[in-house]
Amino acid sequence: MEEPQSDPSIEPPLSQETFSDLWKLLPENNVLSPLPSQAVDDLMLSPDDLAQWLTEDPGPDEAPRMSEAAPHMAPTPAAPTPAAPAPAPSWPLSSSVPSQKTYHGSYGFRLGFLHSGTAKSVTCTYSPDLNKMFCQLAKTCPVQLWVDSTPPPGSRVRAMAIYKQSQHMTEVVRRCPHHERCSDSDGLAPPQHLIRVEGNLRVEYSDDRNTFRHSVVVPYEPPEVGSDCTTIHYNYMCNSSCMGGMNRRPILTIITLEDSSGNLLGRNSFEVRVCACPGRDRRTEEENFRKKGEPCHELPPGSTKRALPNNTSSSPQPKKKPLDGEYFTLQIRGRERFEMFRELNEALELKDAQAGKEPAGSRAHSSHLKSKKGQSTSRHKKFMFKTEGPDSD
């Protein structure tokens, strides 16, 4: 094989000879001049200073001395301290729990709801037995305001949501983080507010600085001509089952009537469940409520056995109808009809025997009839059949 010819334009790689040629090209004056001996002595520590520095920790006053002893040493950059983890967001706690007790006041303030069934297509329904509203997310929930006399001018209606259970009452009810980021804002309501008012431009959304609770306020408007009540349309903007929000905890909506100064004129409340199928959930909870409402008989003190239920009904119990033991003779014309009635009688006797409503003698007689397809007699009763031909008349 022929060796490849080297290109004369390519220089050979560096070697010991080329390095010596490059070294001769350097200037005669040394670039790296040694430090003066005095400067080297200044950088060195005496044995006493070294022993003291090893035995004692340098205080804040000794830091300048160390920097003066080594003016040419660059300060070592301190390692960056790791950032502390951000604290987990906690639920805002309220300093007070608003009252949920019904107060009609001097104006007879009370609430009303539209009558609706439990169909699957319903979006909002109210259960009078449970005093609970079932509604879908962001659907219209009409609430009627009834008063006996007109409140003073400037009165307002406030709606606030609180948790029903005592262990959660101090927490502020707000939307879950997912629904807070949704682009469903109407330009008036803050994204964290659960309750909104639909179709009212005079609505105000309040964040109490002391209790941190959210509420929505609208001016009270008297009923229109021909109407007996005022209707406000509310929206609930988060499901009851949302993680990070209500998290399946029941809530109450408190509706208060206030004057222009914020003084209470009336109060009422109802429970709310925001779900996907309000009709189904209402029907289920009402059935469970009726089952729990059935009277349960308590055990007497000191007794470990179940007490027998006491019959408190005054109506007399219907007596069982005694079995008819009388026998009859039936005259049948024609063999075909006779066989049909005989089979019918045997079937009825067998049914009574299986139901346990027939005495032992009848059961024995029915079994005997089943085995013998003709006229039969028993010790206790006797069936008589008379066969008549066509010319018996």
From Swiss-Prot:
GO molecular function, one term: DNA-binding transcription factor activity, RNA polymerase II-specific
A single Gene Ontology CC term: centrosome
Post-translational modification: Phosphorylation on Ser residues mediates transcriptional activation. Phosphorylation at Ser-9 by HIPK4 increases repression activity on BIRC5 promoter. Phosphorylated on Thr-18 by VRK1, which may prevent the interaction with MDM2. Phosphorylated on Ser-20 by CHEK2 in response to DNA damage, which prevents ubiquitination by MDM2. Phosphorylated on Ser-20 by PLK3 in response to reactive oxygen species (ROS), promoting p53/TP53-mediated apoptosis. Phosphorylated on Thr-55 by TAF1 which promotes MDM2-mediated TP53 degradation. Monomethylated at Lys-372 by SETD7, leading to stabilization and increased transcriptional activation. Monomethylated at Lys-370 by SMYD2, leading to decreased DNA-binding activity and subsequent transcriptional regulation activity. Lys-372 monomethylation prevents interaction with SMYD2 and subsequent monomethylation at Lys-370. Dimethylated at Lys-373 by EHMT1 and EHMT2. Monomethylated at Lys-382 by KMT5A, promoting interaction with L3MBTL1 and leading to repress transcriptional activity.
Cofactor binding, per record: Binds 1 zinc ion per subunit.
Subcellular localization(s) per the UniProt record: Cytoplasm; Nucleus; Nucleus, PML body; Endoplasmic reticulum
Residue ranges annotated as motif [KR]-[STA]-K motif: 370-372
Positions of region (Interaction with WWOX): 66-110
SUPFAM superfamilies the UniProt entry points to: p53 tetramerization domain (SSF47719), p53-like transcription factors (SSF49417)
Modified residues (N6-lactoyllysine): K120, K139
Subunit (UniProt): Forms homodimers and homotetramers. Binds DNA as a homotetramer. Interacts with AXIN1. Probably part of a complex consisting of TP53, HIPK2 and AXIN1. Interacts with histone acetyltransferases EP300 and methyltransferases HRMT1L2 and CARM1, and recruits them to promoters. Interacts (via C-terminus) with TAF1; when TAF1 is part of the TFIID complex. Interacts with ING4; this interaction may be indirect. Found in a complex with CABLES1 and TP73. Interacts with HIPK1, HIPK2, and TP53INP1. Interacts with WWOX. Interacts with USP7 and SYVN1. Interacts with HSP90AB1.
Pathological condition linked to this protein in its record: p53 is found in increased amounts in a wide variety of transformed cells. p53 is frequently mutated or inactivated in many types of cancer.
Protein's name in the database: Cellular tumor antigen p53
Source species: Chlorocebus aethiops
Gene transcribed to yield this protein: TP53
